[in-house]
Amino acid sequence: MKKLLMILFTTLLLVGCNTNKSIKIEQEVGLLQTVKERGYVVCGVNAGLPGFSAQDDAGNWSGLDVDFCKAVSAGIFGDSSKVEFVGLNAAQRFPTLASGNIDVLARNTTWTISRDVNLMFEFAGVNYYDGQGFLVPTHLEIRSATQLDGAFVCITKETTSELNLNDYFAENNMQYQPIYVEGNKDAKAKLFAGECDVFTTDASGLASARAGAEDPSKWVVLPEIISKEPLGPLVRQGDQEWEDVVRWTMFIMINAEEAGITSKNVDLMLTSKSKEVKRILGVEGYIGPMLGLGMKFGYNIIQQVGNYGESFERNVGPNTPLALERGLNQLWNKGGILYVPPIR
């Protein structure tokens, strides 16, 4: 009997060892390897939010979130063009990421505990600090959000914007009539057609909507900001290697701005005496190899896409239709709260 029990124990032990070995092999073949073999990154973005992600008439994508996806591609392949963009509305974004049909979601998405924990996603960081506001036509002569009692409000269902709106109106003893929309494009159409009195979403989205109006001067964003909306890219939980690649792509862009490295001077900076600059560009250290990538990981990102500040100015800054100031999205040492771990 003892001999039989010993045989059974040994068999179970061997099976357990083999199972662990199998699991280890599966874990080692992560998404980064899959992306490398496929030859491009699949990135989920907003289907139509000028300044953040939108297509022109020729089908070319541009925007702050689009630049981030291109940066991920540049860091992996040394080529920022190896990206397939998938336009998604608010209802589609999480199921599409969870299903594995996209590698990363960079779609003006707010980092919350429920999305982080319940949906089993990991946010790579914050690439835009925002807050929810209200856009109204000037002819209504509304000066404050506290005057919106009874208003017809264009709102995207099942978003943080809807939850914040409910809280704000309840706390101020007001009521509203929801006009549900599919996204910013649908909201603009309904707002400009007079189907709702006000559109509420992240302030950056309101700036984008106002810029797209036939006459932007006929629309005003009210002064109240009713929420915190830290927006950033996210990936599925359970793949630390891929999460690190996505996260440090963002951190490279922000650290590069802090170090004064731009797409215009990146080649000159290769000879910089600064140890930080050398680490960012791969002249010294092993930042790229630590992520499973090449030595020119940081260099390729900055050379082909630029640092965070360049991307901001190009897509949403004061000289664009959105005309947004850096505000909270300025570097920590220049009055903002943009602060990321060092390259060390």
Q: What is each of the regions a protein language model found here?
A:
Residues 283-344:
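C-terminal functional modules
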